[in-house]
């Protein structure tokens, strides 16, 4: 009897051990999920979508290239006289057969197409969930198409998941024209909008983010095709955004941790402070100047830095806003209350005498001085701004205070601007990171201060 008990007990232990080994060893990779799991619920499908969002949003913010592309628009300019030199992409002198502006994004397009196809075929998702996931896939694919179009004009439009053995299916020709490219961009983004969520968690795009990006794409499409239908779409979709999304009372907080979930943020880009540095982002490190207290002293600036070490600005700026962008911030006329360009207000005209740029022909004609070390500094002349492409006229304004005026010319230019101007643009007399900024000749942040 005892032997039987022992045998049965031993067999029980062996059976338990075998079962334990089977459960323990029959595992799956911990870093991947099978398709049934991914497309088996809205939560797991959204996890796949969110990972794809991270790859796509970098085309527009947070990457080393996005700010460079923005500097090739009327909004920004890249200006570096040190290591980087002239932008070889903008001049086309730096483009050759190895230049890659996204031609090989087939892996990313495959992810977008998988989102669309797998969601449509899922038997676990509800019809409403399917529609939303598919919309997100169309949104993402439309943005990839948009980035390819704005950089290259034509691209290979992969719109389905292609398997390794489907060689014929992979023979997809490039779009025939910029017109066809933008047609595909707009089709995807328009198809996405009706089923995109109206509200989303921070970091996820909403219907209004899709409408905003579609409006932007349509403006560029019109610039190339001149088709009025694109302007109609801009009005329709941009109006829906402005009518349903409120503006923030804390505009400056939109860009930092003080108001990180503001309702005006339609698609936020978030990173943890613990493992994120200013130096990781071109939008930050390449927009801050590199100026020391010694530079201010040598430049004879009347305003020195408050920072006891004199190192408030330790970036390496090469990207700057254009005059075209700055001029879009209108100034309130002190007499009429009308919003006008800065040089058309009554206060400016009454106090400033405009100088015809054609009369400025000599170096130092308007203003010049020597720094402590003997380096000459002067106001630029039109000859300093000559360019080879006459299609882009230089935006120059010269002026001086009229005799007897007690106003400050910088104050006349910048006071009363659009309320968001001060949070977007660094200008003469403003406060930036706790320091008073001078951009006038010889000022602590002026051209040539170093």
Regions found by a protein language model. Give the residues of each.
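Bacterial Sec-dependent N-terminal signal peptides
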Residues: 1-30
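Short coil/turn linking the two alpha-helices of tandem helical-hairpin repeats
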Residues: 149-151, 156, 200, 220-226
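Conserved, well-structured interaction surfaces
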Residues: 41-60, 79-152, 172-202, 389, ...
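Membrane-proximal, proline-rich intrinsically disordered regions
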Residues: 21-67, 254-255, 359, 396-398, ...
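C-terminal substrate/ligand-recognition segments
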Residues: 398-450
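Polar, glycine-rich mid-to-C-terminal structural blocks
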Residues: 220-223, 235-396
């Amino acid at each position: 009897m005892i032997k039987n008990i022992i045998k049965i007990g031993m067999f029980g232990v062996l059976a338990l051990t075998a079962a334990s080994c089977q459960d323990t060893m029959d595992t799956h990779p911990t870093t991947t999920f099978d398709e049934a799991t991914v497309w088996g619920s809205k939560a797991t499908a959204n996890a796949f979508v969110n990972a794809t969002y991270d790859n796509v949003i970098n085309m527009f913010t947070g990457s080393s290239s996005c700010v460079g592309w923005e500097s090739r628009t009327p909004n920004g300019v890249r200006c570096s006289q040190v290591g980087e030199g002239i932008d070889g992409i903008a001049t086309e002198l730096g483009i050759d057969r190895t230049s890659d502006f996204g031609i090989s994004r087939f892996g990313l397009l495959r992810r977008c197409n998988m989102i669309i196809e797998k969601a449509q075929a899922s038997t676990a998702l509800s019809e409403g969930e399917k529609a939303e996931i598919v919309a997100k896939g169309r949104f993402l694919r439309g943005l990839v198409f948009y980035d390819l179009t704005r950089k290259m004009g034509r691209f290979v439009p992969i719109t389905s998941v292609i398997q390794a053995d489907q060689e014929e299916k992979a023979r997809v020709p490039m779009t025939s024209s910029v017109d066809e490219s933008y047609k595909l961009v707009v089709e995807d983004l328009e198809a996405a909008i009706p089923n995109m969520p109206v509200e989303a968690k921070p970091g996820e795009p909403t219907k209004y983010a899709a409408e905003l990006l579609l409006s932007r794409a349509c403006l560029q499409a019109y610039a190339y095709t001149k088709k009025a239908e694109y302007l109609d779409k801009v009005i329709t979709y941009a109006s829906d955004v402005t009518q349903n999304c409120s503006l923030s009372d804390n505009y400056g907080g939109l860009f930092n941790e003080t108001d990180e979930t503001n309702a005006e943020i339609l698609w936020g880009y978030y990173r943890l402070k613990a493992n994120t540095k200013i130096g990781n982002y071109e939008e930050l490190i390449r927009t801050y100047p590199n100026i020391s207290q010694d530079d201010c002293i040598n430049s004879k600036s009347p305003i020195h830095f408050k920072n006891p070490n004199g190192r408030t600005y330790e970036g390496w700026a090469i990207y700057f806003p254009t005059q075209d962008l700055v001029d879009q911030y209108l100034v309130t006329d002190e007499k009429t209350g009308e919003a006008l360009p800065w040089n058309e207000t009554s206060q400016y005209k009454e106090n400033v005498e405009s100088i015809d740029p054609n009369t400025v022909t000599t170096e130092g004609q308007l203003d010049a001085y020597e720094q402590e070390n003997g380096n000459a500094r002067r106001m630029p002349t039109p000859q300093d701004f000559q360019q080879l492409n006459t299609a882009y006229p230089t935006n120059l304004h010269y002026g001086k205070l009229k005799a007897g005026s007690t106003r400050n010319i910088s104050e006349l230019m910048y006071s009363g601007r659009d309320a968001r101007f001060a949070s977007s643009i660094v200008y003469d007399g403003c406060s930036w990171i706790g320091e008073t900024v001078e951009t006038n000749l010889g000022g602590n942040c002026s051209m040539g201060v170093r």
